[in-house]
């Protein structure tokens, strides 16, 4: 979905984290987070992702091991950039109020679908919804293990 829907994965993770921790996540919070972090996502994270993906395609005339070493370095930089974005969102959501909505599969799926739908250039398909529900299930399973 990161590719097919142009999803900002750190934003999706933030939405899921807030929802399962009993915090409000609504269109206003989504919009505020997008406004704050989209320049970082656009100018830092996405260019690193593009370079990593191009290196992965193997279409450059470099030795495979050297190209792979560079790709791994770019991948590490991309992940570091996403962690910085997550920290930005963490700081921005400290004052988010509690939610009355229970963090169950249906509600978490709806929150994640709101994020994906807001970022996608196309309408969400049943396949997208299936993937969103899988992500919601994984988040809830992880939370159950932590409890």
Q: Where is each model-derived feature located?
A:
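Long hydrophobic alpha-helical segments typical of transmembrane helices together
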Residues: 139-147
């Amino acid at each position: 979905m990161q590719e097919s829907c142009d999803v900002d994965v750190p934003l999706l993770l933030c939405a899921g984290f807030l929802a399962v921790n009993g915090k409000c996540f609504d269109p206003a919070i989504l919009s505020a987070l997008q406004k704050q972090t989209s320049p970082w996502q656009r100018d830092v994270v996405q260019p690193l992702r593009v370079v990593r993906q191009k290196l992965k395609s193997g279409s450059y005339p470099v030795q495979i091991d050297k190209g792979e070493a560079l790709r791994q370095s770019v991948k590490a930089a991309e992940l570091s950039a996403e962690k910085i974005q997550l920290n930005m969102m963490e700081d921005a959501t400290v004052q988010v109020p509690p939610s009355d909505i229970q963090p169950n599969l249906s509600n978490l799926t709806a929150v994640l679908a709101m994020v994906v739908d807001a970022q996608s250039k196309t309408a969400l398909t049943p396949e997208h919804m299936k993937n969103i529900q899988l992500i919601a299930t994984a988040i809830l399973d992880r939370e159950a293990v932590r409890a």
